[in-house]
From Swiss-Prot:
Lineage, top ranks: Bacteria, Pseudomonadati, Pseudomonadota, Betaproteobacteria, Neisseriales
UniProt binding sites for Mg(2+) 2: D173
A Gene Ontology molecular function term of the record: magnesium ion binding
GO terms for cellular component: cytoplasm; ribose phosphate diphosphokinase complex
Organism from which the protein derives: Neisseria meningitidis serogroup B (strain ATCC BAA-335 / MC58)
This protein's record includes keyword Ribosomal protein: no
Amino acids binding D-ribose 5-phosphate: R198, D222, D226, T227, A228, N229, T230
CDD domains noted in UniProt: PRTases_typeI
Keywords: ATP-binding, Cytoplasm, Kinase, Magnesium, Metal-binding, Nucleotide biosynthesis, Nucleotide-binding, Transferase
Name of protein: Ribose-phosphate pyrophosphokinase
Active site: K196
Amino acid sequence: MAAYDSLMVFTGNANPELAQRVVRHLDISLGNASVSKFSDGEVAVELLENVRGRDVFILQPTCAPTNDNLMEILTMADALKRASAGRITTAIPYFGYARQDRRPRSVRVPISAKLVANMLYSAGIDRVLTVDLHADQIQGFFDIPVDNIYATPILLNDIKQQRIENLTVVSPDIGGVVRARAVAKSLNADLAIIDKRRPKANVAEVMNIIGDIQGRTCLIVDDMIDTANTLCKAAVALKERGAERVLAYASHAVFSGEAVSRIASSEIDQVVVTDTIPLSEAAKNCDRIRQVTIAGLLAETVRRISNEESVSYLFNEEVMTGSMLLP
């Protein structure tokens, strides 16, 4: 990709490695800024170069530590706004707080996803770019444009390179059926669904498998892996019902708590995730966990937004496996 006079990309401390990969694809340098903390823990931001009139992107996931990383975005956006940046887009590969998107049974809880959307708007951000939002309808919480892109092209390319035989794509729950069905269609593979239900109170949850998995390689697809507890239980259920191998592909490697050790001792043969969230050392050293990069996809999306080109074009079937999306 060629360099652009107006485009600038800044990052905080959440995932600088991904930001460096993105700017290499764009053939530009990463914006020069100091993002640190004062002695009392408050976020300290200083822009170290001119941004007046520029088209600026802040690339930062709001993974753990979620609040610190979110505050870095907000303070950096405020600094850019006060320095007269022409347009401010925040690229949030992993959008934290997305699971708090409703009030189930009208319980007294916040809708934190909406609160974060309001905070980003109030900070002076003009546009938001995300990857695989936990729920697509969160885009409606924003009063500014949102481009929610999908890691599917990257994951599909990786799956196809593995040349897996007897493949069945598995949705880990009813809510993930649309995603799993789309992947199965792209791979010309069978589809299975895990139906989790608790027969009655104080009775262990039962996992029913809808679909034929006997002797098959089962590929579980999901948007994120958090504690990996449900994923590991699903792998046990699939193996008990005759699955030959169990693989898992997910966009976001949240890996909270004992997730990595759970995966290492589970029935899962391999977990493949993208680099929207950086891996811990434990995850990097786990031979069952492998990471692929979405830097090429993010860079092309940034380029298209900056040039006022179509983003949805990237997800047409004809171009979903295009070389411009590869690392």
